[in-house]
């Protein structure tokens, strides 16, 4: 990992450690659990193993334990990042989303956004771009010290 990635991870860890949650919407947790399970199942299949074996090997946990922990942490992170986006006016407008997607589509050699995103929804891309935008904001405003 490079320095920037380490800084981003440290900032995100500190940010999340300073957030508390009374509860997390079950639908949001389920959304992340389903997405992770689909991704893991696909990767496991590519390696010729089942999803449980894959998560045990890569994460040291059975699939159900990994999904439960991962989905809850990701849902909490999503809520916290959205709160920062709302407070700091960092939300991504439809126009900004289209511009970002068009830039990526063009760079990747696609004629249209639709060809570029395929089966993925624009909202999934909005979430992805928002994560990066808020993380950049947090890093820019963090007080970073070298230990």
Please place each PLM-identified region on the residue numbering.
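Extended, charged alpha-helical "arm"/coiled-coil substrate-binding scaffolds
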Residues: 1-147
């Amino acid at each position: 990992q490079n320095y920037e990635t380490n800084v981003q991870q440290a900032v995100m860890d500190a940010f999340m450690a300073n957030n508390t949650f009374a509860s997390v919407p079950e639908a949001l947790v389920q959304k992340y659990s389903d997405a992770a399970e689909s991704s893991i199942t696909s990767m496991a299949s590519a390696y010729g193993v089942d999803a449980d074996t894959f998560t045990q090997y890569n994460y040291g946990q059975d699939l159900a334990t990994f999904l439960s922990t991962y989905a809850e942490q990701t849902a909490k992170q999503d809520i916290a990042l959205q709160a920062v986006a709302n407070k700091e006016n960092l939300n991504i407008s439809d126009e900004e989303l289209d511009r970002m997607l068009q830039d990526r589509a063009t760079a990747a050699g696609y004629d249209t956004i639709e060809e570029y995103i395929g089966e993925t929804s624009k909202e999934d891309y909005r979430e992805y771009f928002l994560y990066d935008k808020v993380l950049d904001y947090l890093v820019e405003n963090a007080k970073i010290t070298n230990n």
